[in-house]
Swiss-Prot record:
PROSITE patterns: MRAY_1 (PS01347), MRAY_2 (PS01348). Belongs to the glycosyltransferase 4 family. MraY subfamily. Keywords: Cell cycle, Cell division, Cell inner membrane, Cell membrane, Cell shape, Cell wall biogenesis/degradation, Magnesium, Membrane, Metal-binding, Peptidoglycan synthesis, Transferase, Transmembrane, Transmembrane helix. It comes from Pseudomonas fluorescens (strain ATCC BAA-477 / NRRL B-23932 / Pf-5). This is Phospho-N-acetylmuramoyl-pentapeptide-transferase. Its cofactor is Mg(2+).
Length: 360
């Protein structure tokens, strides 16, 4: 929005041309979203407390979690508001990738909001029934996948890139739609499963989002893309503004979500952020790198799959409790130790993901 204004004002003062720089608008996106989250956070927490919108805690979980009962939830609305406002202010709204990522994020956030509303406000422990949750996730995921497939400007935009192998890629054709669907929906649910401890999901999301922002910037620049042997995706660089907003909003939310949390993001935040990461990774053709960098999300998801499959097949549980962060808690790890160690793992995995830019 402000970019369009700056372009108009350039005829009166050439200094406004500085807003053409993606890096500047990315930084402004971070600072704007961070400021919004920090300023609106206390008000939102008070509002949630006054309306008694608090988290319910399972009795069969770690005993240390019982003290969390009643902590305000649905704080993900703060993250989405900060991301949305910052992106609309600083991104080029003529760029269709910006709208795809923003609309997917808000759509999955709406699914999470309905789920949280039914659980917290209507006191329905089931929330939004799983079949309806996955139905709407499928609708929005497939919608985004089909749109990206139909608007692809070159074959490389629908080709699966294999990291570290410069001469190996797989043309997907219509299979691009299937892969994109699974990446978006899978990423959304993986982040949601990870969101079980104070700050556990948001910091890895920020780190992975920041790394994807680097991929967006490089993929959107033809010279960098050619030098690094990554797909050149015209217009993808503009997503650095969204990624910047995600970083700022995430850090602002972490201010209130760090142990002991004053607010939880709820499904409204977790489902939306996961879908955003998946959509961005698809656009810049880095699905496998997302799998690497988001290893914590993958580990959490696999722990649930393994636990359920093992119990159904053998009647035994592999872990003391799933997702796996609860397993470590029940082993005696203090919650902050679990959180920080998962953060450290994410730092390592993100560095490995970034290293694939040169390892070819």
């Amino acid at each position: 929005m402000l970019l369009l204004l700056a372009e108009y004002l350039q005829q009166f003062y050439k200094g406004f041309a500085v807003f053409q720089y993606l890096t500047l608008r990315g930084i402004l996106g971070v600072l704007t979203a961070l400021s919004l989250a920090l300023c609106l956070g206390p008000w939102m927490i008070r509002t949630l407390q006054n309306r008694q919108i608090g988290q319910s805690v399972r009795n069969d979980g770690p005993q240390s979690h019982l003290s969390k009962s009643g902590t305000p939830t649905m704080g993900g609305a703060l993250i989405l508001s900060a991301i949305g406002i910052s992106t609309l202010l600083w991104a080029d709204l003529r760029n269709h990738y910006v709208w795809v990522v923003l609309l997917v994020t808000l759509a999955f956030g709406a699914i999470g909001w309905v789920d949280d509303y039914r659980k917290v406000i209507e006191k329905n422990s089931r929330g939004l029934p799983s079949r309806w949750k996955y139905f709407w996730q499928s609708v929005f995921g497939l919608g985004a996948a089909i749109f990206l497939y139909m608007t692809a400007q070159s074959p490389v935009e629908t080709t699966l890139l294999i990291p570290m192998l410069k001469d190996v890629s797989i043309p997907l054709g219509i299979g691009f739609v299937v892969l994109t669907y699974f990446v978006i929906v899978g990423s959304s649910n993986a982040v949601n499963l990870t969101d079980g401890l104070d700050g556990l999901a948001i910091m890895p999301t920020v780190m992975v989002g920041g790394a994807l922002g680097i991929f967006c910037y490089l993929s959107g620049n033809v010279k960098f893309a050619e030098y690094l042997l990554i797909p050149y995706v015209p217009g993808a660089g503009e997503l650095i503004v969204f990624c910047g907003a995600l970083i700022g909003a995430g850090l602002g939310f972490l201010w209130f979500n760090t142990y002991p949390a004053q607010v939880f993001m709820g499904d409204v935040g977790a489902l939306a952020l996961g879908a955003a990461l998946g959509t961005i990774a698809v656009i810049v053709r880095q699905e496998i790198v997302l799998f690497i960098m988001g290893g914590v999300f993958v580990m959490e998801t696999l722990s649930v799959v393994i636990q359920v499959a093992s119990f159904k097949l053998t009647g035994r549980r592999v872990f003391r409790m799933a997702p796996i962060h609860h397993h470590f808690e029940l082993k005696g790890w203090p919650e902050p130790r679990v959180i920080v160690r998962f953060w450290i793992i994410t730092v390592i995995l993100v560095l490995i993901g970034l290293a694939t830019l040169k390892l070819r």
